[in-house]
């Protein structure tokens, strides 16, 4: 998987280096397996050109921590501005949807890694955005299993569709809190 990709040319250059390495190993008499090529979507330029990048890759992984940081120009480790690190920012949610759709159109798998998938409500929202593969710390796996088992993807798709029409983090938080109060948003049954 190629990290911090920002352009199609970078992917092509990296794939050429990979091919050269495979040819060198084959020339030495070694058997080289087919290696799927993945792209980390971590910067806005990669997210915005996802439809082009999808033609060059076998899969995407969206690195939400970096994508949020670089899209919002906020250093999540700097206490002076880290409060502006907003996973629910409309731009972030729209980028996630855009990348998922681009991958789907090209028929490639897209997964999500980062802290978003480790938060129960955000995980439900990611499911509502059509994302189905997640990477997280081992400690978050039991929670994620429970959330996935209890979540109605259909209901969360409705919630996500509404969330994607809202213009501010505050409006999104308000809507989600109302949904939670109504019926534990996204739960089966």
Question: What would you call each of these model-derived segments?
Answer:
Residues 1-189:
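Conserved alpha/beta-domain cores
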């Amino acid at each position: 998987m190629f990290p911090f990709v920002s352009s199609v040319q970078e992917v092509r250059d990296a794939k050429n280096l990979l091919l050269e390495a495979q040819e060198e190993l084959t020339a030495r008499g070694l058997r080289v397996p087919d290696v799927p090529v993945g792209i980390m979507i971590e910067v806005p330029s990669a997210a915005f050109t996802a439809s082009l990048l999808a033609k060059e890759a076998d899969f995407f992984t969206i690195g939400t921590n970096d994508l949020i940081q670089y899209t919002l120009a906020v250093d999540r480790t700097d206490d002076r501005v880290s409060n502006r690190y907003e996973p629910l920012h409309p731009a972030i949610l729209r980028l996630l949807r855009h990348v998922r759709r681009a991958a789907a159109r090209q028929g490639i798998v897209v997964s999500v890694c980062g802290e978003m998938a480790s938060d129960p409500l955000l995980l439900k929202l990611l499911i509502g955005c059509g994302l189905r593969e997640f990477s997280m710390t081992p400690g978050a796996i039991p929670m994620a299993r429970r959330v996935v088992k209890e979540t109605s993807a259909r209901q969360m798709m409705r919630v996500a569709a509404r969330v994607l029409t809202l213009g501010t983090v505050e409006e999104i938080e308000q809507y989600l809190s109302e949904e939670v109060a109504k019926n534990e948003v996204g739960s089966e049954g």
